[in-house]
Amino acid sequence: MSLTARVSLPPHPLVQALHAEWTKLRTVAGPVWLLAGVVALTVTVGAAAAGAAQCQSATCGIDPAKVSFTGIYPGQAAAAVAGVLAIGNEYSTGMITLSLTAVPRRLTWFFAKAGVLTAPVLIASALAVAGSALAGLLILPGRGFTPAHGYASLTAGADLRAAAGAVVYLTLIALLSLGVAAAVRDSAVAIGLVLGLLYLFPIIASLVSDATLARRLQQIGPLSAGLDVQATTGVNSLPLTPWQGLGVVALWTAGALLLGALALKFRDA
């Protein structure tokens, strides 16, 4: 008789880190409430905007997708805070030392944290966008967005692109916030930086008198560039194409994650 030894190999460090971070996420109430806030804010504000919109002629010039997804403007703030606190709470509670003791490979831990954050944010974003789109489909036809006024369908390819892009946008904002929080290691400072980055570019662009400078600010600001992906009318007049705008947000996110990873790698915890 031959005996075959069964060797149990330990899980890959990344798998262990993902499991540990997922356990943290689902046992802490804060992230759940923040992600619920993303859904509630996005859908509520979007439905209110749809109810307030009015199209009485074929030349009203209102983009129904942008109206339906108006709630993303406040909803992204909740996504940003969720991203910041995913890292910020580690530093404020002192858990960072235990986390890095359990997972000595810092970059492995960091990208496990990012991966675990991505999944629930993506789900919450999809629910928020789907709820907003449904509200728009139910409300906007009664507000004049009908074939008679040039709105043949609210489920055309451009509308589906706007919805998919909005989901990706919210997810990228959460990851951008995670990177900023890892770089500065202070939740309040990180939240201020992220919200400033999002909301100040459009404000400054609206105040400057130079049209070229204003357009440039719209092209590089993550909010103004990223939310161009919602546009279904007047696309040719946008500072960037919808997918180019989302690409700008992806670049901001990649830069923030890189800074956060470098700070975690080379600075003491």
Predicted regions: what they are:
Residues 24, 88, 99-101, 177, ...:
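Helix-capping/transition residues at the boundaries of transmembrane alpha-helices
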Residues 30, 105-107, 111, 186-190:
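Membrane-helix interface segments
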Residues 261-269:
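Membrane-interface capping segments at transmembrane-helix boundaries
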Residues 21, 103-105, 180, 186, ...:
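Generic structural signal for small/hydrophobic residues in well-ordered secondary structure
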Residues 2-12, 31, 35, 39-84, ...:
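Secretory targeting signals
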Residues 83-107, 114:
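Transmembrane helix boundary and interhelical loop/hinge segments in multi-pass membrane proteins
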Residues 14-26:
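A short amphipathic helical element positioned immediately N-terminal to and/or at the very start
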Residues 187-223:
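Transmembrane helix segments
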